[in-house]
Amino acid sequence: MLVFEFKAYGKSAQLVAIDDAIRTAKFIRNSCIRLWMDIKGTGKNDLQKYCAVLAANFPFANELNSMARQASAERAWSSISHFYDNCKKGISGLKGYPQFQKDCRSVEYKTSGWKLADNRKSITFNDKKGIGRLKLKGTRDLHFYQINQIKRVRLVKRADGVYVQFCIDVNRFENIEPTGNTIGLDVGLKEYYTDSDGTIVENPKFLRIGEKVLKRSQRRVSKKVKGSKNRGKARLYLGKRHLFAINNAYNE
């Protein structure tokens, strides 16, 4: 499974619709967790059926695509099954009891509810949330893959905007010929690693480099009045600085 990510661009009304879809996905997941807590013996199929009940009782839940509702129920069951596995294995300490999600930043669609343009430069979400057509910008080329190979589409919200992730079902084969050489690695804190040939790679310390900026940005947020626009702006800037440090670590 390959995951390709593109930056999405849309109007302000579309961004509001994306926020609404993400909140609805969070509501469905938390409702499934509550059902599992209240009714003993609730299984995965029961959570899938409960999605239809939520759609019938809540109009905003009915606006979300049916497969997107099922994907949210699968997220709830994933946390439940993880808790069951930890209990069966007898892991010491906390077992990871399913918790209600407070901050949700993504909504996942399966094979329906969206349509990719022929030029692969835009995607249209056609459920009742009103997201509509979003422009895509990225370095990956989706022309190499068929539409039926795209099994999941995620809308992910970050500090610097909205991203669209495509989960593509493809088998990767890499012909790797062994060289016959052996090497030893010593991973440390001062140096990132030192191999047996004497090569030393320094620790980049991305968090330490941007720590002063992060602390200063956090102080700016703390000094602002709660609920004010200035606090919202400072909070967004702080999120972008955190995202900048994370992206540097991933790109290295």
What is the meaning of each model-derived region?
Residues M1-E252:
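Nucleic-acid substrate recognition interfaces
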